[in-house]
Amino acid sequence: MSARAAWLVQAGCLDYAQVWAWQRQLQDNRRNNPDRPDVLLLLEHPAVYTLGRGSSLAHLKFDPQHPPAPVYRIERGGEVTHHAPGQLVGYPILNLRHHRCDLHWYLRQLEAVLILVLANYGLTGERIEGLTGVWVEGKKLAAIGIQVSRWISLHGFALNVCPDLAGFEAIVPCGISDRAVGSLVEFCPDVRLEVVRSQVAGAFAQTFELDLQPCSLEQLQAEENLTAIAGDP
């Protein structure tokens, strides 16, 4: 069987709220037309905190009325996390009916993608029983949080390549107080985010058996009739 075609959109550092709105539009489009191609968005965000749908404010070390960066409560599972430049974020908008209708399988597949990427650097990415994400030598390098509606996925994964980790000090990342957050640059000082982005795309295509076809952000906006949120330039 030939690999299913999907769109790969690689962008720079984009506003969180705008990308979140686009994700929801992409998900809606696939709920209405399940045969539309899968999409993988790879990008970065300015500093921001996101809370899962059931996240506890107890994991914030700052006053929510005066946050150090914007805070959003979103649809994904999991506790609070932090995004910042230098962290590669991946948002797969997949119709899992074309893959497997199994959320546990999907989470493990996302972990497998990141483990493959880390192997390029001679690092052994590890899973921890009962938790979601990927660790290297006890440090969490990748976080995962998803939402699925009618088997169309939303949100995804974040790999710390070379971000300023100071932003994580203002929270209990993912609600896990006894495990440190780390980044790829700590283990590989010469790592470059654009190289990692390409490696993530390759590992994703391999793991999900997809033919990822480059698609510019402008093409995606036109194909999917994506709209800007109020106040976006």
UniProtKB/Swiss-Prot annotation:
Domain of life from the UniProt record: Bacteria
Chief place where the protein resides: cytoplasm
Reactions accelerated catalytically: octanoyl-[ACP] + L-lysyl-[protein] = N(6)-octanoyl-L-lysyl-[protein] + holo-[ACP] + H(+)
CDD domains assigned: LipB
Binding-site list for substrate: 76-83, 143-145, 156-158
EC number: 2.3.1.181
Residues at the active site: 174 (acyl-thioester intermediate)
Residues carrying the site annotation Lowers pKa of active site Cys: 140
Pathway: Protein modification; protein lipoylation via endogenous pathway; protein N(6)-(lipoyl)lysine from octanoyl-[acyl-carrier-protein]: step 1/2
BPL/LPL catalytic domain segment(s): 34-212
Pfam families: LplA-B_cat
Location within or outside the cell: Cytoplasm
Any single GO CC term annotated in Swiss-Prot or TrEMBL for this entry: cytoplasm
Keywords assigned by UniProt, alphabetized: Acyltransferase, Cytoplasm, Transferase
Gene Ontology biological process: protein modification process
Molecular functions (GO terms): lipoyl(octanoyl) transferase activity
Alphabetized NCBIfam families for the sequence: lipB (TIGR00214), PRK14345.1 (NF010925)
Free-text function comment from the UniProt entry: Catalyzes the transfer of endogenously produced octanoic acid from octanoyl-acyl-carrier-protein onto the lipoyl domains of lipoate-dependent enzymes. Lipoyl-ACP can also act as a substrate although octanoyl-ACP is likely to be the physiological substrate.
Family: Belongs to the LipB family.
Further information: In the reaction, the free carboxyl group of octanoic acid is attached via an amide linkage to the epsilon-amino group of a specific lysine residue of lipoyl domains of lipoate-dependent enzymes.
UniProt name for this protein: Octanoyltransferase
Native source organism of the sequence: Synechococcus elongatus (strain ATCC 33912 / PCC 7942 / FACHB-805)
Phylogenetic placement of the source organism: Bacteria, Bacillati, Cyanobacteriota, Cyanophyceae, Synechococcales
Gene behind the chain: lipB
